[in-house]
């Protein structure tokens, strides 16, 4: 029973969002994390510890209900936990781990040994997301968050050598738009998308310059995002999902040309039927939606000089 217990008295300290991932390289293998990293090769029937404590493990920050930073009496909130785990898509046995108290570690031998690769001078912070570049096995990005310390400064970092050195790429993201996630596009190298407290930011030059990319979204706190099937999929703190359908035009944008002819995505002609299609005799018409227009939809933007008079 964890209700009202101090974190220091628990064998394992799990984060509220304790990470669990499946291995891209080993069948039936998953990783889960508390202050240690656990591994199963049999779909969870048995687990083994494959890391030491990868947090700061500071006793004074492991009080009742996870205090002082994560006070929550039922024992589901703790501090000094692993907050993010990611396996390299390029190399088996290469795993990055981040903690909610600001440490980053890497193993390149499946957990036999670990190296502290925390950026020098990084203050105590939540390592909220880690993203291995889909284009280069040695490049990795992290998103840090310090709102629990009343610090709303964005914190995005990039390494090109497995975390040996880091560069802050937060650039011109404004104070207040503190960061929770950053991803690199899987087709255009250097195209980054970041989720912040104030919405989505995009960079076409690997973080040198950022632009607000909310489009038709209201101001939203972004908790996670990913690029899948050429779509940008966004999760918000308000428990909603937003999808930007087709990243193709974004990938082609060069930011310089006044005139640009974009290549449209390939169109798919569908021909199918569904049991939900009916004449409402069985009450299923409520499931009927409106399909997109047939053919290719063409959108053009034209720069116009407006007249200065009322005509």
Feature map (PLM): residue ranges:
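Beta-propeller blade termini and top-face loops
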Residues: 1-286, 293-294
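Short edge beta-strand/loop segments characteristic of extracellular beta-sandwich folds
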Residues: 297-301
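Conserved small/polar residues in nucleotide/adenosyl-binding loops
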Residues: 302-308
């Amino acid at each position: 029973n964890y209700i009202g217990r101090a974190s220091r008295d628990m064998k394992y300290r799990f984060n509220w969002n304790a990470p669990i991932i499946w291995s891209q390289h080993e069948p039936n293998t998953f990783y889960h994390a508390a202050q240690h990293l656990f591994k199963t090769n049999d779909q969870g029937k048995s687990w083994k510890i494959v890391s030491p404590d990868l947090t700061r493990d500071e006793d004074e920050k492991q009080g009742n209900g996870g205090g002082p930073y994560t006070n929550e009496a039922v024992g589901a909130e703790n501090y000094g936990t692993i907050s993010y785990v990611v396996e390299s898509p390029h190399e088996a046995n290469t795993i990055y781990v981040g903690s909610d108290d600001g440490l980053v570690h890497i193993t390149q031998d499946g957990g036999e040994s670990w190296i502290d690769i925390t950026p020098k001078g990084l203050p105590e912070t939540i390592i909220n997301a880690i993203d291995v570049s889909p284009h280069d096995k040695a490049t990795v990005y992290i998103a840090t968050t310090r709102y629990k310390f009343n610090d709303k400064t964005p914190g995005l970092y990039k390494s090109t050598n497995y975390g040996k050195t880091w560069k802050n790429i937060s650039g011109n993201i404004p104070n207040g738009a503190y960061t929770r996630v950053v991803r690199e596009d899987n087709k255009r190298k250097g195209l980054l998308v970041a989720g912040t407290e104030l919405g989505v930011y995009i960079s076409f030059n690997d973080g040198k310059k950022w632009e607000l990319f909310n489009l038709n979204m209201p101001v939203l706190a972004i908790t996670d995002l990913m690029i899948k099937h050429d779509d940008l999929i966004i999760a918000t703190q308000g428990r909603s999902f937003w999808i930007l359908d087709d990243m193709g035009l974004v990938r082609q944008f060069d930011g310089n040309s006044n005139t640009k002819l974009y290549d449209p995505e390939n169109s798919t002609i569908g021909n199918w039927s569904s049991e939900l299609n009916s004449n409402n005799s069985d009450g299923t018409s409520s499931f009927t939606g409106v399909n997109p227009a047939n053919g290719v939809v063409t959108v053009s933007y034209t720069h116009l000089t407006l007249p200065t008079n009322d005509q």
